[in-house]
Amino acid sequence: GVSMANFMKMAVNEQRKYRGEEPLKASEFLRMMREKSAIVELDSKLTSRAVNEGFSGGEKKKNEIFQMAMLDPKLAVLDETDSGLDIDALRIVATGVTKLHTKQNATIVITHYQRLLDYIVPDVVHVLYKGRIIYSGDKTLAQKLEREGYDWLINDYKE
């Protein structure tokens, strides 16, 4: 398979090409990889392995945030990024997401558990039901849902 380093170099340089920028020199790319992998405490040995081959669940999640750091998207959608993570990996991944947040980008984090929000403070919390946003609020909404569940919202929802 393709190594993480080669995959990321190709992705980063294609993105730079699209923006009319020169490809990164090898030394610049390696420096960038070291800086970005430090954000999620990604073991440098993983970058020489094939993409996600033999990665643990936590390593895959860290790798997703590492890729996000390398590509610096304007919009990132993280679907249950907390799924299957132990508390240490959850903290590392969430801290990485928080460090990458700027005024120039947006991250949509989909989760069913409030514990992720102990580390990522959302600007807004939306509750989706049957494909629609039925309720919005701040972090306190997530805390209430953790305590009381969703029934109180769904019972009040009229299609």
Indicate where each model-derived feature is located:
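Conserved H-loop
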Residues: 104-112
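Hydrophobic residue in the Walker B motif beta-strand
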Residues: 76-78
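Walker B catalytic motif
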Residues: 80-81, 88
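Helical segment within the ABC ATPase nucleotide-binding domain
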Residues: 90-103
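Helical "lid/switch" subdomain of P-loop NTPase nucleotide-binding domains
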Residues: 89, 113-116, 120-121
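ABC-family P-loop ATPase nucleotide-binding domains
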Residues: 1-74
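Conserved D-loop-proximal element of ABC-family nucleotide-binding domains
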Residues: 86-91, 136
